[in-house]
Amino acid sequence: MSQDNHDLSTAGIRPAFMVRVAGLPVESVQELRCPQSRRWADEVLNESAQLRLLAEKAGDQLHDLIGGSDDEPLRRALLKLRRDIFNNRLPATDSADRVLDRVHSLDQAAASTLADWLTGRRALDGRLGAGAGLLAAETGRSREALRALAGHERLRRGLLLASPALDAQLDAYRKPPPSAGARPDKKQRKIERSLLSYVYRTACKTSPFSTFTGVALGSLGGSAGLRLRVEEEWRAQARLNVVALGRLADAVIADPARRADLPVAPASGWGRDDDRVRYVRRWVTAGDDDTAVTFDAVKDRLFFLRRSGTLDRLLTLFEERSGTVLRYGDLVEWLARDQGAAREECEQYLGALLDVGMVQVPCLRTEVHDTDPLRAFQGALRGLERPWADRLADRLEEPARCVERFADASADERRALLDALRAGLRAVQEEELGADRAKVPQTLLYEDAAAGGGAEPDDAGPGPGPGPAKASRTVQLDPDAWQELAARPLAAVERVLPAFDLTLPQRITFEGFFLARYGRGGRCDDLLKLVHDFHEDFFDQYMTFTATRTAYDADGTYVPEVNWLGLDRLRALDTARRTFTARMTALREAAGPGAAEVRVDDAFLAEVAAELQGLAADFAPMSHHLQIADRPGDPLVVLNRSYGGVSFPFSRFTELFDGLDERLFAGTEAIVPEGAVLAEVTGGPVTSNLNLHGRLTPYEIVCPGERGTLEEEFRISLDDLHLVHDPEAGRLVLRSARLDREVIPVYLGYLVPLALPELPRTLLLLSPTSMAPLNVWAGVPEGPPDEGGVTTRPRVRHGSLVLSRRSWSAPAAALPLHRAGATEDGWFLDWHAFRREHGLPDRVFATVSDTGARGATGAKPQYLDFDSPLSLSAFEALIKTPQARVVFREALPDEDALHTVSGHGRHVAELAVETAVPVRRRTV
């Protein structure tokens, strides 16, 4: 049994963590604002509010005068003036002054109120008149600032990879317009909006991509509180898109002459079943090379071929020649001799086996540990020991040098290198390999940037205490400040995360399927057949049903998980989710409609955690993406995302920091339960650069159809594994016969498990891998909108940990969108009136749904600065239909609460941390 439990007093993060740092300091976007226009808008709105109070008072006083007067001309004049005041319409000066004189003779108090309103309304009219010129001048200056930002080296380096088309337009865009203050034409405005989105992405968001966002390796240490300092100068690393290598390999294999020289092997893990040969067949669906982000989709399935004399003899040959190189051409010649058949027939037969994956060419695959994929590909070619392969490897030398020079090159040099790289890859395919039309992906390179933290921290293993830093370059976080701010609330919230884990129902279902087949304490030695039967008999149909399931129906009632096996653990999960929703609903109702914040207490979390008892694995290392809001007197830490797994924050960046993989490898020993080992599930050949990483586990599981990347002694074949149910612990245990130890599968890539082939995906149901998006408002009624059509959600926090940011939701029809004929200053003023009326902060992230927008922009939160007309215009361009709905979320932390600095200024940053997991004792 496991030693329980989550010790809330000692839980902390592992001393090594990652910091994701926005590429531009936040000060860079301040120049895009119109501060004087904002002050003008505030003054207008303040004066308007005061005038409304005066107008109400004056209206009442005039009402009394009208009712008490028999002078019909005076009554008509007073009625007209009262209507003007009610409609906030400034009357003509002469007529208003005459009426004011008459009122003064009748009621001095009313005259005083009326005089104040007229004076204020005339002053407001003058102030309103100043808005157009002021806004136009400041908008012009903000456009100049945007043009200046368009030349920022860090922005342009990333932009060249993210949007080459936009990058190519920016030099012309940066030139001053022919006439100062002229409104840009339609094409220029489109460029402006696209550029603005990338500027905000680089200054205000933290998703690593090239130099848009850098990463720094951090450690617990020092005594600087929550303040982090990163380096001003960044270093980058570029790698060729592995899809480009896949296209090269396809071209080599497609050429009969070169194919003859390629070593071949049967699909690993194949076996004989009576009159059939069984193996895992893998299908690869090529991605679209013309899209910016593409990778080849892979699926696998247990497959059978009818045994025949020819196939049996061929497989026997492979067995007899095990450990020696068998080339495709040699195999064709052997078949011709053995069968007495024509070479063409033998080519056709072997080609068919290649097509169905029974025979494979493994040497040209990119594997997860090929952290320099192009150099690895060259090495594989030279290992063929054939003149054409050496020549092809030599032809790839110039593209390889382009890749190596790219990271340190200027933006102009990068353009030339990309052009040379693309031309070189095309030439290799067309000139060297004879391809009619070269296949080269649109995105040729992927790049990551280090924002410091390259020095080795003293200890990368788990534990709450810090180790002294060995170099000043390491980003350091004060452990005492972290413990006080986040350790306890984060540990408490971790206890309820299984309720939100998207993979937990699948893990419970797989265990239920196993128990139905093998019973309590049962054992399965044929995992390949188990996985095949699970998918064939149950899981594929189950996934079809769950894909259409909505967690809550139209009435807000929770919809239970699909539970065809009648599993009590799934019912317990449903109960925990209902409990969470009921407690959140009660919390919301108690807070009232105007609440800005609600607090989840310990009792709330304890009640939900009690329902989850025994559902989650006892070995559950977690990773969290967090942002610190360093507010005076009330600092907060915001939980953005949570994942389960080992070394997840680091794996993608191991090649960026010297020695990081070795330190992480060593650190895992302290978190693995006694009697268990970690073994990586790779998912097979790499189809995305996101899956490249150094070695982080002592072992790897080699699935059928894979060849493995480690030395033989560290490979665990599927045949060596068996699955057994531990009735005492109530869990499934994967064990290795050779090692006589429990094996914990670990996935270190960045693709979602659903994108992996069937067999690795199923093995991960036995791993700590999880995805737990914390949607605290799921199933909680929104409540009625306010008079302006806006509904709100308060911020949700547990202690200093924010679980959900404050938000506002509105249909497009409720927004003060720019309408034909409206003035720019009037439109700007309307937005600030809207913001003020509904209590929105100055800066938010806006998510537009149901827009029909294409690409990532339509789905992701966009930074919106209400003080910038350029930002407002770019946001409005995302709203394509009247049916669109917008959710505004507070920018937390906002720019006044940022805790990460460099010599350039303050930076938006996000911490990627792993929570420390004490060693748990197990007996099986």
Regions inferred by a protein language model and the residue ranges of each:
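Type-3 copper protein
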Residues: 1-238, 344-685, 857-924
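Acidic, low-complexity/disordered tracts enriched in E/D and polar residues
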Residues: 2-12, 196-321
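Short, Φ-rich (hydrophobic/aromatic) sequence segments
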Residues: 152, 159-257, 744-806, 810-813, ...
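Segments forming glycine/polar-rich beta-alpha architectures that bind adenosine-containing cofactors
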Residues: 244, 248, 253, 258-268, ...
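Elongated alpha-helical scaffolds
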Residues: 306-309, 326-327, 344-348
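Short acidic, hydrophobic short linear motifs in intrinsically disordered regions
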Residues: 323-335
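Short, positively charged loop/turn segments that connect secondary-structure elements
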Residues: 336-345
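C-terminal structured domains
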Residues: 627-881, 886-890, 910-914
